[in-house]
Structure formats: C-alpha cells, structure tokens
Amino acid sequence: MKKLTKRARSNLLNALVILFTIVLVIYLGAKNGDIGDAYRALRSARTPWLLAAAGTWSMFMVFEAMGLHVFFRQQKLKVPFRTSLLVSMIGMFYSSVTPAATGGQPMQVFSFKKRGVPTGLSSSGLAVKFFCYQTALLALGGVMWLVHPGLVADCINRGRVLVATGFVLNGVTVALVLLLAINKNIVRGIITLLIRAGKALHLVKDVAKTASRADAALVDFHASVDMLTHHPVRLLVLLGISVVQVLGQMSIAYCVYRAMGQSAAAYSEILALQVLLQIAASFTPLPGASGAQEGGFYLFFQDMFPESKLLGALLLWRFFTYYLTLIVGLGCVIGDSADSIRRRKRSPLEQPEKGDLPIEPEETQREAAANLRNPAAPATNNLQETERENS
C-alpha cells in the first residue's frame, strides 16, 4: 500500500478536523434533543433573508477582491478584476482548510505569479489588504464597544479570555505588519534565517539564487508599500474598501437572525456580537477556527434566539460564513487547475489566457519595481551580501 505524502496527510487531517466539528455539533444537538427543533427551524427559515445572507456573503467576497484590484491599479499594474476575484476565492478556500488560515496567502501569491504578477507586488498587496482588514475589524469592534457598552461588557464577562486574547493578537498582528512594512532590515533578517533553515533541511539547493529571487521580491514589496505611505489617500481608499468588506461579512449574522423569525434586537446589536466573535475566534489554530466559532456563537448569541432555534441558527450561520466559502472556493480551485492542465496540453508555449498578464522575465520585474520606487535608484542584492558576510 502506497504511503501518503506529508501534504496528503496534512490535508486529510484538516478535513477530519472539519468533519469532526460538524459531527460534534450534530451530536451535541441530538443529545440535547435539539435536532428536531433545528430541522423545523431550518424549514421555516424566511427565504428573503436567506437571499440577503447570500448577498452579504457575495458582498464580502467582491470587496475582498476589490481591495487587491484597487491596490494593483494604484501600482500601475493592470490586473483584470475577474483574476483578483478568482485568486481571492482560491485563497479563501486554502485559508479555510489550513490551520490558522496559513495556506491562503502563499497560494494566492503562487496563483498571481502564474498570471504574471511579480511576487513582491502580490505579497505587498496581500500584506496591505490584511493590514486594512484587521484595522477595520478592530476599529469596528471599538465603535461597537462605544455604542453598546453593556452588551459588549456582558459578552466579555462570558468569554473574557477569548475576547481579550482576540483583541491582543489582532492588535499585535497589525503592529507587526506595520513594522515589517517599515523596517527592511527585519524582513531581510527573517528571510535570511528562512533560507538558512531551508538549506539545513535540504529544501533550498541554491542559496545564492534563492536569495537573489527573495531580494527581488523584497524590493517589489517595499517599493509598493512605500508608495502607499507617500500617498495616504490611497491607503484610506483601501481602508474604506475593507470597512465595507467587514460590514458585509459581519452582516450575515443579522440576516440569519431575521431568517429565524427574530426581530427584537437591532442590527447594531447583532453586529456588535458578531464582531466580538470574529475578533475572539479568528486566531484559533484550527481550519476555519473550527470549534471556537461554533462555541463562540453559542456563548454570545444564546440570548438572541429561542432555545428551539439556536442550533438551527448556528448551522445556518456557519453555512454562510464558512461552508459556502469552502464549496465555492473548491469549485474555483478545481476550475483553475483544470484550465491550467487544458492549456498545458494544448500548447506548452501558449501565452496566458486573455485578460491575464504576460509572465515577464525576472530582470523585467526588477526594473518595474525599481521604477516604482525610484527610476534612478540602483537595485542592490542585500540578501546575497548578508549570506556572504555570514559565511
């Protein structure tokens, strides 16, 4: 019997974690006698509000892609919106099936590279988008705290450790992204350590070549981030897009609330609870924050739904916030893979599909990055120099 590869074992483990969470929720519901109630609640769910939930999910995904699309436009890089949307969905899928969402951004960088987007530019775009999303989430959490202090205080009392940890980790992450974007030496040192580790683990064969490519990507990264720091209006535009994106994602809970026939709580109250839940559970080191999201929903929303509808609301909410992304994202991954295979079979030398960027030589990408930064600035290979000094 052929042994599974390390990647296959990892994928299998992640799938089992997701499946275990589903089974556990159903088991607990059955044990408490809630399955029948959940079934009746789901059958009686109001269709207009289910469509609204699908609409807010679509809004979340469209503005996820819009942030990348606008960033590339700001960098004078014409990436079609459909490419940004497809790659965003691919990234969402891999984020959903890997622990702590660690697989999303690397796959997005790889997908953009296949379409001719320099690695440094796509990396900086994803970093800026991540920074804007986390900032928008924390800012919205702060606003909700001011608007509904009693409701937030009650949630904190119920899940003090979860909420406090979530705020701290999100805040530290934002600060870390800022530090990495500003301080080139820290980033360069981290990359050097990673290359050394890769060499020691026999993952990196040619240290000089790897360092050269990493340095070229680093030049692209800081050139595009520097451009944003010198044009704060552009950064504010990206922040505005992220605010709309977060509102779309957080509004799913209100649509589910109304779909279950509830109307006593105001939109802002449900929004406050959902934002707190997202902040508290987002850094759980399991695929899709499984377990923390479901437990947090019970913890924060138990007073918003009748007991007979709570499990049904949880299942419906989890479908729109997680499983729908898995389904659509998987479709995008399969479609993209099938399209790549089809094009390779048709002609190994075929150009990228219409609308994609031509894949440029590494030297051309370096020149483009240098022009973004300063047309007269010489490109330096600091990583190689660091390697020579250390050796």
Go through each PLM region and give its residues.
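A short amphipathic helical element positioned immediately N-terminal to and/or at the very start
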Residues: G36-S44, F112, A217-T229
